[in-house]
Amino acid sequence: MFLKELKLTNFKNCESADMQFSEKINCFVGLNGAGKTNILDAIYYLAFCKSYFTTTDKQNIRHGEDFFAIHGDFVTDNDETETISCVQKESTKKSFKCNKKEYERLADHIGKIPLVMISPYDRDLINEGSDLRRKFIDGVISQFDSVYLGDLLQYNKVLAQRNTQLKQFWENRYFDANLLSLWDEQLVHYATPIYEKRQAFLKDFMPIFQKYYDIVSGTTEKVDIIYESALHNKPMEQLLQESQEKDRYSSYTNVGIHKDDLIFLIDNHQVKKFGSQGQQKSFVVAVKLAQFDFNYQKIGFKPILLLDDIFDKLDDNRVAQLVKLVGNDYFGQVFITDTQRQRIQYLLDNIDGNHKIFEVEKGEVKSDE
């Protein structure tokens, strides 16, 4: 699958753009703040129904306008064209369509356009809270397992309802254990398969991740990702029962898969505490390349790969290795941003495969062709 054409209207700093892409490598060059990353974010939007960088859809509307629109024509491995479009107005909810047919649930679109983004913000995966690491593992699995995504959405819905019930108990100064157990049963129902699939995913993911870390880092360091969960020791039902008193007085569900975490290790040392800046950069890039490979093996066709400002992450030699790697036939369509035209041109001239370069300036996009 590849993105053939992308049209933007009032998306972030871009008033209007119409781009036709190479099936292999596409590069956006321009100064910082020109809008290169915004183009990658628009592509990401078409895959995940949301921005990679902002949490509120309306924040993506160009200043002074009242809507944005993104339209992408994707060519499938069967040589069929699928048009994905998103329109967000100030006054209405987001409209998301595939071939002019609007989705009833945005979750039905997830996995249709497999895609992996590598961004300087990925270091937050190491240094920030556990919610980002859960989002990572959930995002990878959801791209090839719609049942997992459905269970996860239902778990979060029931969790919110259980927390609301706990708050009502506290506010009304009464407690009904039987009523709470109804929510517990549903949490157990959804939590157990999610936990099991997270475990299975990491078991299969680790050898792929180690392979890419070796390539990116150029070292023989051993990396590991440890899945931390209270469900390792006790079933979800027992955890909820033992935490009932604490939950009652905190008005919050203190145990469950929503508290799970991933611990990142290099040679048995936590990357967050002891990893150098170079090790952290190599770690997150390798994680994302392994995500590409893992999803490719699972779904049978190549995800689109977005490389945002990779020179911020790696030194020039590592970047040259990375561009050469993603330029081979195993990888599919790739989008790259850089601030230096001469640098990216040199890298592209030293690999096989067709490519296209776009100049970006103040939200305006111009192709070499």
Protein language model regions, located:
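Conserved short hydrophobic beta-strand within the ABC ATPase nucleotide-binding domain
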Residues: 43, 357-358
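Conserved NTPase motor "head" modules and their coupling/switch loops across ABC/AAA+ ATPases, GTPases
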Residues: 1-31, 174-304, 313, 317, ...
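Hydrophobic "anchor" residues on beta-strands that sit immediately upstream
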Residues: 37, 95, 115, 304-305
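An accessory alpha-helical subdomain
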Residues: 118, 124-217, 228
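Walker B catalytic acidic pair
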Residues: 308-310
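Nucleotide-state sensing region of NTPase/ATPase domains
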Residues: 48-132, 141-144, 148, 206, ...
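Conserved P-loop NTP-binding catalytic core
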Residues: 11, 15-96, 155, 170, ...
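Structural recognition of the conserved hydrophobic beta-strand(s) that form the central parallel beta-sheet
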Residues: 72, 333-340
